[in-house]
Amino acid sequence: MGAVSGKTFYIETFGCQMNAHDSEKVVGTLLAEGYEQVATPEAAELVFYNTCSIRDKAEQKVFNRLQNFKREGMKGKIFGVLGCVAQQEGEKIFDRAPHVSLVAGSASYTRLPEMLVQLEAGNRRVTGLSLDTEETFDTPFTRRDNPHRAYLTIIEGCDKACAYCVVPFTRGPERSRTSESVMAEARGLTEKGYTEVQLLGQNVNSYRDPSPAGWDFATLLAKVAEIPGMRRVRYTTSHPRDFVRPIVDAMDANEAICDHIHLPVQSGSSKVLAAMDRLYTRDEYLRRIDWIKSAKRRYSLTTDIIIGFPGETDADFEQTLDLLDEVQYDSLFSFKYSPRPNTSALAMEDRIPEEEKQRRLLTLQEKQRAIQIRRNAEMIGSIQEVLVEGRNQALGQWIGRTTCNRTLNFSHPDTNGNELVGKYLPVRVTRSGPNSLVGESAALV
């Protein structure tokens, strides 16, 4: 393609698993073209930021980082902004950060070598912002960060248009990958030694196979879990509107599908949910929770909650706190509402004062912390299978993840090297905290 071999690059990733996987595609694509990845921006000739725009704080972090580099006088480097902020802001990024030379959205990663050649040829600024492509599904050079767990994208974009969310604008409409393509990549991963796969999408539940097979998400999930050598299958993220009973049935029927369901509720108030354009009520959400809790297996439940959406009253907030008591989530991600461009909520009045949003957020987090302490304590004495991920050198322990997505630090007679990484071990839980478990190996390797 004409790219200059030997160019060094650094990439920093902000945001979700989708962004992390996108960065893996960027790294693999550039390595295949002869570029060399380095560990620090100071050592790189090309500096990329793969960005998140879901909240204003994440966006500002990127621009602050760019300004710091400008002040530090890192001359001679090429700076590139990738991902959701790139898609959202486009060429306006050049005005906010004039030393940036490249702006590329999430559907343009395979074009990066070509764009870099344009910069080498003398173009001062290059953009890649088209969403009219499915090329991100088929990036053959993906360089995965983890040798045992792999991300696998099954759907891109979102059609839901929630009032607060910029994702439909930055990621485009829903585009499902063919089941044949998904299955081929999943089989290829197991053949390379990967034992855990996480199916990714802005809304995995709305997956619809565009090929004649016509699989829905529940069918795809079951088929991936049946692949020989596939030990664990996870998925994220789900939209409650599209979370249907057959998904739970598929999980019950195949133990390779992990005991964890992330089902973002956003609010416990039906009034706020309607204002958010979430397309379900509190009762409809709780009906799905009933499906999960009445299943054959015990599933870990996690969620997302937005605090301080315009018009949220004290009574609305109390309904959200009440929902925590009713559902008993194993953990949650909570955020203050952040106005985003190109969203309908941007024009809403009755904004909640920042100090009140902060008070509500802390109240919510305090309640959830108590629930998590209790939920984790219930696991003391149980034996959990963990996939060993590494070592906690400071504590002299190993770190693993359970099928229910809890972090478990544990002791084991093998205290040297990394011989256990990638193995599945039974671990007895002996202690617990609000965010993790502690245990000891229940069997020698």
UniProtKB/Swiss-Prot annotation:
SUPFAM superfamilies, per the entry: Radical SAM enzymes
The keyword S-adenosyl-L-methionine is assigned to this record: yes
Cofactor: [4Fe-4S] cluster
Residues that hold [4Fe-4S] cluster 2 according to the record: 158, 162, 165
EC class: transferase
Cofactor-binding details, from the entry: Binds 2 [4Fe-4S] clusters. One cluster is coordinated with 3 cysteines and an exchangeable S-adenosyl-L-methionine.
Subcellular localization: Cytoplasm
Transmembrane regions listed in the UniProt entry: none
Reported function: Catalyzes the methylthiolation of N6-(dimethylallyl)adenosine (i(6)A), leading to the formation of 2-methylthio-N6-(dimethylallyl)adenosine (ms(2)i(6)A) at position 37 in tRNAs that read codons beginning with uridine.
HAMAP family: tRNA_metthiotr_MiaB (MF_01864)
UniProt subunit comment: Monomer.
NCBIfam families associated with the record: miaB-methiolase, MiaB/RimO family radical SAM methylthiotransferase
Family per similarity comment: Belongs to the methylthiotransferase family. MiaB subfamily.
Protein name in UniProt: tRNA-2-methylthio-N(6)-dimethylallyladenosine synthase
Lineage: Bacteria, Pseudomonadati, Acidobacteriota, Terriglobia, Bryobacterales
